[in-house]
């Protein structure tokens, strides 16, 4: 065994062995318990970042641990390869997105493999490959047949200069990110998936996911947004020219008598009707079309509106209510209209105040009145007043009674409403999965026959930013109608990339199956036992995946109900932010690795300078690692300098997995020192003792060795629980570090001590092997020549070693530590109390004082109260 720890040599040796032996190839074995561990697959952006390293190390630790527990483990990897960034990069570099994507995949694959991940690379997939997205297309056609996919118009962001649709993130302050043109809202035909058909099941099944964080389940429940309320119909006031009745859904029917106006979205048919004869309204509608589309944005933007001059009739009082167009009403939610109760809704209050509309209070607190005029909306449940025959009722009785009255008049009824909307999957983009439909003048919309799938995306196009390249490529869109044979045109929209990621975890079970979407192997591996990914995917990706798997279940393709049994959402990786402000006020960011910190004599930070020019830079606190802030750390450089095991160890030790991790160079260096110490401890032991020939004789151990062996087996039990149940990798590592510190203090060189050292080091290598597998692979070969670490089971704590003859008790005086005593484990309490009172260190604090009582926590401490 060489004396020094050289991570590059060691990691090369281990990885070569794993590759040559196909160590992590997963094969179905019905007689074995399976464990399917999956970290969310990455977008091939070009290089790994530290968030990737953390994500995939967590999954690898769990995979390796369960392998040692006897499970048949599957840990695959693939690439979420379609998407807008590839198109942007293609425009910048004048290369097809396909080349950019495949080059990135090749580079990132090498990076991942350098981390020593126990993955079955034979199951690798990329969503941009035709043999993958063929099945997107196939299932989409099945959904069309079942009515779970359909075509209707939808509103999109439109850049009038580039003549292209923009994603929400491409709209910056109302303007296109590339051209700076004011973005318009256009209504175009789009395809939707009917996720609302599964709304109830998606909501109720959250209760069957105890292995998911409560926060994620709550976020999904809120997104689905099931609410119970009343659908109210406000009859049209024909004299005002109102063309139709207005339907409104409300969860606060108790406030119906406080309605002072009705507001509609700019896209509502009533708004369009009113604008035909009113240029000012038409201009306002156009302004709204250039505004925000997202609910979160609407909540913060200034409330604006225009009176249409149209009226509806209050369904119970008969009062005429003005109809306004308001920019805070979304067409995509409810009926695109709201009944406005300014006294009891914050948005309505703000709007009514802005436009001097009436504010009529009809709800008051249970135990007090309301001060009128209101300074703000009173939004709590309370007691109705000024509500005719419904005055004096609490919330639910008022809602029930008003719903009955509306139903009797044919102007309303109780309804269940969902915030969830159907999933619009059409994207007017090139780099995505083609939608398998053909438009024929004679036959209409014609599905591509199954035998003609996949509709292959051409991979040699280079986007220029002006529209969808597919719509300008006749070789793609020109085709013959499958029904009549006449000339026809392919659909040039592509699918939302969330479609690709909604079922990839299923395809891993059978990536070599080319004749069907799935096969029987799916029934063995699925559902995923442990899924790992960022909290930012809590809603869309996870919800769409749950929906997609339920559709596949109902089509008879899979047996499971929920795709992910357990979910771990790892925290972000943070680093310092360093910057300067230029004379023009622009902020220039610098990587913290290029900055020298200045400290005073006490080591306190007093400043920072850029190493390149020696000039000061400002510290902007701690923030998520990102390209925009230039505060990332290159994993490749870290691995090259310290080795993959150091990177893995730091990532697992620096923070519990669900919490944010603050980057610290000192922490990385500390992890490296620990591995060097582990290597040296094994080296020194083998130099002194050689390889052990057999188990140590435990019967004759003295007190010191017994205590050390107790700590060893206590550590084995703790680490197993920390890794397998609690997933607190940092505390598992800390326990091993404490054990190593204790071993380092051992001066005994007797055969028993050397035997105990061998037992301890073997178990330490086993315990650490899921976290730092390379060094452990090599150390095991040194400790146990002729055997391989991968063949070893997880160590089990020796119950006999955990039975203590002697225990150490803490002695407190008034709750403060004042001494320690060692006693036999079966010592009677009265003797323990006497020994505590007689302890020399303790006596200094109690001499001359009256002892009021002695409190004992068996096996732990004695507290003397004076």
From Swiss-Prot:
Which biological process annotations from GO are given for this protein? leucyl-tRNA aminoacylation
The molecular function terms of the Gene Ontology recorded here are: aminoacyl-tRNA deacylase activity; ATP binding; leucine-tRNA ligase activity
The UniProt keyword set, sorted, is: Aminoacyl-tRNA synthetase, ATP-binding, Cytoplasm, Ligase, Nucleotide-binding, Protein biosynthesis
Q: Which family does it belong to?
A: Belongs to the class-I aminoacyl-tRNA synthetase family.
Q: State if Zinc is listed as a keyword.
A: no
| Record organism | Nitrosospira multiformis (strain ATCC 25196 / NCIMB 11849 / C 71)
Q: Tell me the gene name.
A: leuS
- Please indicate the residue ranges that the annotation assigns to the motif 'KMSKS' region: 624-628
Q: Which CDD domains match?
A: Anticodon_Ia_Leu_BEm, LeuRS_core
One GO CC term of this entry?
cytosol
Q: Where does this chain carry the motif 'HIGH' region?
A: 42-52
Q: Which HAMAP family match?
A: Leu_tRNA_synth_B (MF_00049_B)
Q: Which InterPro entries match?
A: aa-tRNA-synth_I_CS, aa-tRNA-synth_Ia, Leu-tRNA-ligase, Leu_tRNA-synth_edit, M/V/L/I-tRNA-synth_anticd-bd, Methionyl/Leucyl_tRNA_Synth, Rossmann-like_a/b/a_fold, tRNAsynth_Ia_anticodon-bd
Protein name per Swiss-Prot or TrEMBL: Leucine--tRNA ligase
* Subcellular location(s) of the protein: Cytoplasm
């Amino acid at each position: 065994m060489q004396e020094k720890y050289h991570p590059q040599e060691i990691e090369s040796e281990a990885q070569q062995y794993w590759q040559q032996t196909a160590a992590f190839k997963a094969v179905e074995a019905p007689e074995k318990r399976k464990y399917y561990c999956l970290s969310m697959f990455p977008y091939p952006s070009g290089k790994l970042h530290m968030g990737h390293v953390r994500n995939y190390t967590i999954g690898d630790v769990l995979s390796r641990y369960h392998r040692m527990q006897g499970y048949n483990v599957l840990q695959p990897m693939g690439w979420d390869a379609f998407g807008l960034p590839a198109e942007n990069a293609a425009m910048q570099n004048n290369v097809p997105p396909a080349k950019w994507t495949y080059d990135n995949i090749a580079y990132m694959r090498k990076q991942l493999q350098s981390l020593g991940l126990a993955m079955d690379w034979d199951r690798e997939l990329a969503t941009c490959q035709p043999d993958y997205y063929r099945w997107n297309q196939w299932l989409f056609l099945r959904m069309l047949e079942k009515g779970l996919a359909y075509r209707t118009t939808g509103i999109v962001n439109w850049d009038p200069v580039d003549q292209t649709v923009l994603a929400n993130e491409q709209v910056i302050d109302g303007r296109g990110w590339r051209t700076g043109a004011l973005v318009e809202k256009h209504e175009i035909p789009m395809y939707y998936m009917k996720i609302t058909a599964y709304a109830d099941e998606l909501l109720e099944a959250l209760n069957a996911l105890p292995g998911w964080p409560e926060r994620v389940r709550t976020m999904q429940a809120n997104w689905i947004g099931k609410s119970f309320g009343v659908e109210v119909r406000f009859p049209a006031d024909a004299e005002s020219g109102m063309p139709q009745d207005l339907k409104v859904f409300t969860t606060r029917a108790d406030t119906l008598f406080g309605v002072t106006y009705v507001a509609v979205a700019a896209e509502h048919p009533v708004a369009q009707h009113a604008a035909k004869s009113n240029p000012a309204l038409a201009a306002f509608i156009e302004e709204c079309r250039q505004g925000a589309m997202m609910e979160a944005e609407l909540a913060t933007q200034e409330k604006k509106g225009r009176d249409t001059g149209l009226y509806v009739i209050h369904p119970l009082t008969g009062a005429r209510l003005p109809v306004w167009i308001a920019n805070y009403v979304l067409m995509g939610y409810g009926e695109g209209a709201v009944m406005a109760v300014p006294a009891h809704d914050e948005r309505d209050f703000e709007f009514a105040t802005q436009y001097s509309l009436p504010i009529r209070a009809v709800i008051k607190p249970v135990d007090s009145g309301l001060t009128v005029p209101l300074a703000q909306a009173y939004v709590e449940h309370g007691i109705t007043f000024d509500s005719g025959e419904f005055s004096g009722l609490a919330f639910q009785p008022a809602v029930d009674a008003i719903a009955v009255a509306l139903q009797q008049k044919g102007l309303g009824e109780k309804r269940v409403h969902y915030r969830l909307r159907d999933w619009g999957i059409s994207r007017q983009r090139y780099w995505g999965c083609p939608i398998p439909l053909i438009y024929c003048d004679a036959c209409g919309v014609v599905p591509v026959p199954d035998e003609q799938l996949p509709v292959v995306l051409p991979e040699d196009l280079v986007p220029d930013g002006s529209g969808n390249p597919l719509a300008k490529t006749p070789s793609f869109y020109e085709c013959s109608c499958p029904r009549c044979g006449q000339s026809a045109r392919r659909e040039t929209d592509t699918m939302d990339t969330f479609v690709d990621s909604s079922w990839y975890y299923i395809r891993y079970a059978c990536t070599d199956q080319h004749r069907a979407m799935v096969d029987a192997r799916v029934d063995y591996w699925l559902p995923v036992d442990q899924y790992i990914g960022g909290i930012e995917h809590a809603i869309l990706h996870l919800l769409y995946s749950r929906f997609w798997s339920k559709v596949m279940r109902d089509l008879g393709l899979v047996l499971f109900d929920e795709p992910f049994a357990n979910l771990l959402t790892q925290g972000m990786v943070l680093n310092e932010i360093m910057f300067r402000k230029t004379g023009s006020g622009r902020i220039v960011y610098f990587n913290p690795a290029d900055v020298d910190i200045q400290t005073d004599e006490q080591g306190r930070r007093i400043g920072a300078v850029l190493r390149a020019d020696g000039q000061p830079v400002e510290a902007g606190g701690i923030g998520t690692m990102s390209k925009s802030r230039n505060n990332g750390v290159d994993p490749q450089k870290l691995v090259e300098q310290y080795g993959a095991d150091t990177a893995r160890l730091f990532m697992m030790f620096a923070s519990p997995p669900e919490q944010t991790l603050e980057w610290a160079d000192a922490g990385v260096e500390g992890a490296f020192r620990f591995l060097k110490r582990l290597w040296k401890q094994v080296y020194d032991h083998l130099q002194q003792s050689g390889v052990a020939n057999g188990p140590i004789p435990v019967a004759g151990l003295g007190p010191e060795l017994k205590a050390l062996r107790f700590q060893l087996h206590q550590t084995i039990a703790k680490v197993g629980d920390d890794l397998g149940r609690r997933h607190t990798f940092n505390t598992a590592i800390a326990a091993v570090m404490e054990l190593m510190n204790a071993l380092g203090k051992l001066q005994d060189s007797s055969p028993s001590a050397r035997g105990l050292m061998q037992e301890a080091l073997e178990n330490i290598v086993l315990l650490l092997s899921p976290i730092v597998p390379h060094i452990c692979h090599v150390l095991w070969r040194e400790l146990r020549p002729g055997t391989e670490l991968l063949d070893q089971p997880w160590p089990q704590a020796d119950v006999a070693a955990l039975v203590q003859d002697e225990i150490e008790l803490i002695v407190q005086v008034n709750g403060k530590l004042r001494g320690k005593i060692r006693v036999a484990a079966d010592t009677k309490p009265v003797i323990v109390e006497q020994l505590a009172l007689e302890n020399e260190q303790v006596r200094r604090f109690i001499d001359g004082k009256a002892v009021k009582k002695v409190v004992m926590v068996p096996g732990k401490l004695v507290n003397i109260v004076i």
